[in-house]
Amino acid sequence: MDTMSEAVKPLTVPKELMGPPGQFNPTLLMFLAAVAIEILSILGYWCWEWLDWCCFTMTVIALHMVGTVIHDASHNVAHRNRIINAAIGHGSALMLGFSFPVFTRVHMQHHANVNDPDNDPDHFVSTGGPLWFIAARFMYHEIFFFRRQLWRKYELLEWFLGRLAVAALIYTACQHDFLGYIFNFWFVPLAVVGLALGLFFDYLPHRPFQERDRWKNARVYPNRILNLLIMGQNYHLIHHLWPSIPWYNYQPAYYATQLLLDAKGCHQSLGLSETKDFWHFVYDVFLGIRWHRPRSPEPLETTAPISQALISQAPISQVSQAHSSLEVTQGVEVRS
């Protein structure tokens, strides 16, 4: 009978949804498209007399796209070729005013310490003040990177060269009188995109910032339109459970593992329908200050499948491989 044949049903992510693809995959194509859009925006402003709002909007779209690219590149799932993966990671970082090694190392710490007020760098980004100011708090990543001494090998040099490039651009803008363009058509779009990234990558997926259990420290809020607009970040829990899944496979991975998530009691809504939750959100928009109290350790599955020592000391590629090797343990069997 069908019931007997399905008595033991493994719930795992299909292998074809995991791992970095090669050749012209969606992430690489999106990076190239973002670069092309930004070049058109610059040429449209300086050479073709396009409307300011058109150039501004194009830059916002380009920066929004590379926000997902740098995220996948930090997990080594932007491209199977490590050189290409690093190249588009550094390119995206330059467009966003980030440093790729800083973003990657700090992001790995976030994965190891989700919702830990002391060790999760994104916890401060999300809860360190009003939500409308969240973009500026991304600069805390750099403070965290140096305070924890997270760099390895040539990453300090990479950081220096990236910051030197930004400084050289600003200096050139001052010398040739286009600093106003830099502010209005780069810094302001960065603030807009930073707000969106902070909201959809950090704040909404992890609120109310209390759960440490790996199955409950993030959430999903399924919606096919949002999946396109924010490139899968409404399935953020899927990313935390299986970091080797590229962004464009979050949604199919969610539906493939929905029974597993149900069995684990995972959060599968935005979590703002209750009156109390809604007013907490309003508070965070305008004020967002929290006072953290020491809590006793919780006997839960921890958020860190690998040790902090490995994350802070190992080469980035090894950290990604460690994450991938441990993902196979996250499936369960449901018995009738």
Locate the predicted segments by residue.
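Juxtamembrane helix-capping/reentrant segments at transmembrane boundaries
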Residues: 78-98, 116-131, 213-226
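Non-catalytic, topology-defining segments of multipass membrane proteins
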Residues: 1-62, 93-188, 247-336
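Histidine-centered catalytic micro-motifs
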Residues: 66-76, 103-115, 202-208, 229-245
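Long, highly hydrophobic alpha-helical transmembrane signal-anchor segments
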Residues: 47-92
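Long helical/loop segments within the catalytic core of UDP-sugar-dependent glycosyltransferases
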Residues: 61, 223-233
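Residue-level signal for cytosolic alpha-helical hairpin/rod architecture
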Residues: 88-89, 197, 235
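Transmembrane alpha-helical segments that form the membrane-embedded catalytic/substrate-channel core
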Residues: 60-70, 99, 103, 188-212
